[in-house]
A protein has these predicted regions:
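Gly/Pro-rich hinge or "lid" segments in bacterial periplasmic/extracellular proteins
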Residues: 1-57, 62, 72-73, 181-192
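Ligand/substrate-recognition segments at binding pockets and active sites
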Residues: 35, 70, 77, 91-92, ...
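Ligand-site clamp/hinge motif
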Residues: 13-20, 47-96, 234-235, 243-245, ...
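Extracytoplasmic
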Residues: 23-25, 36, 58-60, 80, ...
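Short helix-loop capping/hinge motifs at secondary-structure junctions, enriched
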Residues: 47-50, 125-134, 176, 194, ...
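Extracellular/periplasmic solute-recognition and catalytic clefts
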Residues: 31-42, 66-126, 137, 145, ...
Length: 352
């Protein structure tokens, strides 16, 4: 009862938003949160980390996080020095800023690699996508090179699975799925999807009814990169007899759709851990519920057993073998189309 009471209090809005109740051991204290406008933090007096010097030294004395709802406004604010720091700047805006000599005198620009990846989630519950050959076909319709070169302007690298290449248990033997329209067509045909009526869209009889290969691609509105990924997929898919409808959803609606599994394809991203990866949150069947993160319906008894064993294994050599087996299972099932790991696009005022 006491622990339940503590949990309810700890997770309540009061402990997330009210001054005096938001506490921690970091260098700043919470001052104010105006929803949709800003969050203010002040540097603590007599903070323990100041005595250590070096990387733990905290500055400046005050931080204001401004909520800016579109990048056009944010870039204007940067140029006007109304913002001191911005990260995740849109690639095209970032290139323009790099070419702006006046801006470069005021700001330092960085492109550090991110420990994250962008992917397309495929709804395995959808009868159109239940066959792994169809999911493999869709993967062959994604041109990662074009995405990275034309949408990210080279500021990213392709990924082939859920484990970052910097990890010692990354399986470099898993093959990249090449962009190949003809291979996609062949896989669709093998799975029984062909254009039988000449309308340009592959179809198949499913449970006695004719079903066409029409898929919705959902992304969070305002994210131009994800929108354009959908447009590129739409153009490529059409050549293979797959009709893709690109659909924007406001962020909260987008999340709710993925929770309810109300999607065919969605574009998402995961931030990865610098420590040992724990696949359970995303890939275990116990996470396959509305509040869980296994939103593509991946997994079975074999993969669950492997994940459970992996989490309990202390021997590094054995654990690395299990990680590689896990990556192989994911690759064979194709629940995601893994796209790229982005570089962050960061501007920091030169006075810092």
């Amino acid at each position: 009862p006491k622990i339940d009471e503590f949990a309810q209090q700890f997770n309540s809005p009061k402990y997330a938003r009210e001054k005096g109740f938001v506490v921690g051991s970091g260098p700043y204290e919470f001052i104010e949160w105006a929803t949709g406008q800003y969050v203010i933090l002040n540097k603590k007096k007599n903070w323990w980390g100041d005595k250590t010097g070096g990387a733990l030294y905290a500055h400046p004395p005050k931080i204001t996080y401004k909520i800016v709802n579109d990048w056009t406004t944010a870039v204007t604010a940067l140029k006007g020095e109304d913002l001191d720091v911005a990260q995740g700047i849109r690639p095209n805006d970032f290139l323009d800023l790099k070419k702006n000599e006046q801006f470069k005198q005021l700001f330092n620009i960085y492109t550090p690699d991110e420990l994250s990846y962008i992917y397309l989630g495929l709804n395995r519950r959808n009868p159109r996508l239940a066959d792994v050959r169809v999911r493999k076909a869709l993967a062959h319709l994604v041109d990662k090179k074009e995405i990275i070169e034309t949408l990210l302007y080279g500021m990213g690298s392709p990924v082939i699975g859920p484990i970052n290449p910097i990890k010692p248990y990354y399986d470099k033997n898993i093959p990249e799925i090449p962009f190949d329209i003809e291979k996609a067509k062949a896989l669709l045909k093998e799975a029984g999807w062909e254009d039988t009526d000449g309308n340009g869209i592959a179809d198949k009889m499913v449970n006695g009814e004719k079903m066409e290969m029409k898929l919705d691609f959902k992304y969070n509105s305002g994210n131009d990169t994800r929108k354009n990924i959908g447009i590129l997929l739409k153009e490529n898919a059409k050549r293979a007899g797959v009709e893709v409808n690109v659909v924007a959803r406001e962020w909260t609606v987008f999340l709710e759709d993925t929770k309810k599994r109300d999607y065919d394809i969605f574009c998402g991203g995961w931030i990865q851990s610098p420590i040992l990866d724990d696949p359970k949150q995303i890939w275990h069947t116990s996470s396959d519920h509305p509040d869980g993160d296994n939103r593509v319906g991946f997994g079975n008894a074999e993969s669950d057993k492997l994940i459970d064993e992996l989490r309990a294994t202390l021997d590094e050599t054995k654990r690395n073998e299990l990680y590689k087996k896990f990556q192989e299972i994911v690759a064979n099932d194709q629940p995601y189309i893994f796209l790229y790991a982005p570089q962050n696009r960061l501007a920091i005022h030169a006075r810092f």
